[in-house]
Amino acid sequence: MMASTTSATAAGGAFAAAKTRAGSSAAGGGACARVAAGGRRRSGVVVRCDAGVEAQAQAQAVAKAASVAALEQFKISADRYMKERSSIAVIGLSVHTAPVEMREKLAVAEELWPRAISELTSLNHIEEAAVLSTCNRMEIYVVALSWNRGIREVVDWMSKKSGIPASELREHLFMLRDSDATRHLFEVSAGLDSLVLGEGQILAQVKQVVRSGQNSGGLGKNIDRMFKDAITAGKRVRCETNISSGAVSVSSAAVELALMKLPKSECLSARMLLIGAGKMGKLVVKHLIAKGCKKVVVVNRSVERVDAIREEMKDIEIVYRPLTEMYEAAAEADVVFTSTASETPLFTKEHAEALPAISDAMGGVRLFVDISVPRNVSACVSEVGHARVYNVDDLKEVVEANKEDRLRKAMEAQTIITQELKRFEAWRDSLETVPTIKKLRSYADRIRASELEKCLQKIGEDALTKKMRRSIEELSTGIVNKLLHGPLQHLRCDGSDSRTLDETLENMHALNRMFSLDTEKAIIEQKIKAKVEKSQN
């Protein structure tokens, strides 16, 4: 490993040296050109200019040679990666590890997921990537050629995007590898890692990652399969356990929190305002109905979404107000729920101060319940005497109430998670041997075709009917298949037998050596070459 690292360092040095030499020569050439342009025609000057051009050409040739040499060094250093396969990793933070103030800086809007994936996969040691960004979490899933280098590149990307120093980010990030990363995603999809244990909306968000990745072509085979298996795990947990029964969602917890903060005698008469008619907003309306609320004002950019909610939910009066009337609507509300995709606050301290006071019957305080990330309501609004702000981090108070029962159900769900994890790991293990299987079949078929041609030439074309020729070809194919059956059986790693991955990989290495297939190094070299060439363009 040390030798390989040295090789890579030497390669980097070759690049740097070539660039330095090329830069110096180019600068010299430019100076000569300026002298010549100035009208000095002495032979000495002309000779020096010619010499400068020649030196520049030589420097370019040296730089090109250095690039080739560096690429060869990178090829040699492929041994660094051959000791272990590419790693699946998740790097992220959630409501459990970081405050909303940090999460909102890292939040990636759904329409920007494809661009984020493109930026991540352009990093030198990242092959595949996916982004899961919700109000409670921001997680990046990658397949990394090198664990340490890949993690460092992703953390640097997150730091650059958010403006948060990498050292500060690391205090709140969690990093999981391979089966731990996969299990985490399966638990997320099943609602086991949610602030609200068992909530259902996260499964829809995991599905959206797959749809978004497929539409943009950004998901590789490992990440794509992992997310699809996570969806399967999430569905099974909800169908085969009762974890979702009675489980609250972020939206229902927001409604519950608001009612907890209102005087009990005035809960049903409180004037409710919802800003944002998206998925979360729709769920707020649904849970207001469940609590007996008869009227809600909904502010939204367009009326179509509000009409759709009104059409679906007949048990409540829904009044539409356009976005331009948001502050007027807030002035008439006792409770303001916010759930929009705005990246800047809709309500600041100045806005809250301008709103009229609330009646003493309602506690004299206007409640802002903000379930958006980034936040729609500035924290400083709470500094206003007649206003209180609650965000998603404040929902824990509600969640704790019925947590024990769902924790027991979560234990049942872990059995399903483990089953789905084993299926995914078996599938991924099987990928290790696919290149060897293909190479071995191709190698055997080339020999078969060559020997068959020699045989047919000896017999003579005229001596064979079409049926006889076809029979001979089928015979040769059958012999090859019979001979390959045993070796290929020992390359199986799909979880259907007791053979371990180490045993299978040992068989694969043996076949690579015996038949000079050399598939591993060729694949790694190809990946590294593509990365190097991409970085040079």
Swiss-Prot record:
Keywords: Chlorophyll biosynthesis, Chloroplast, NADP, Oxidoreductase, Plastid, Porphyrin biosynthesis, Transit peptide. GO terms for biological process: chlorophyll biosynthetic process; protoporphyrinogen IX biosynthetic process. The active site is at C135 (nucleophile). Pathway: Porphyrin-containing compound metabolism; protoporphyrin-IX biosynthesis; 5-aminolevulinate from L-glutamyl-tRNA(Glu): step 1/2. It is found in: Plastid, Chloroplast. Substrate binds at T134, C135, N136, R137, S194, E199, G200, Q201, Q205. NADP(+) binds at G276, A277, G278, K279, M280, G281. Gene3D superfamilies: Glutamyl-tRNA reductase, N-terminal domain, NAD(P)-binding Rossmann-like Domain. It comes from the Eukaryota. The keyword Metal-binding does not apply. It catalyses: (S)-4-amino-5-oxopentanoate + tRNA(Glu) + NADP(+) = L-glutamyl-tRNA(Glu) + NADPH + H(+). It is an enzyme of class 1 (oxidoreductase). One of its GO terms (molecular function) is NADP binding. Its main location: plastid. InterPro entries: 4pyrrol_synth_GluRdtase (IPR000343), 4pyrrol_synth_GluRdtase_dimer (IPR015896), 4pyrrol_synth_GluRdtase_N (IPR015895), GluRdtase_CS (IPR018214), GluRdtase_dimer_dom_sf (IPR036453), GluRdtase_N_sf (IPR036343), NAD(P)-bd_dom_sf (IPR036291), Shikm_DH/Glu-tRNA_Rdtase (IPR006151). Belongs to the glutamyl-tRNA reductase family. During catalysis, the active site Cys acts as a nucleophile attacking the alpha-carbonyl group of tRNA-bound glutamate with the formation of a thioester intermediate between enzyme and glutamate, and the concomitant release of tRNA(Glu). The thioester intermediate is finally reduced by direct hydride transfer from NADPH, to form the product GSA. Catalyzes the NADPH-dependent reduction of glutamyl-tRNA(Glu) to glutamate 1-semialdehyde (GSA). This is Glutamyl-tRNA reductase, chloroplastic. It comes from Oryza sativa subsp. japonica.
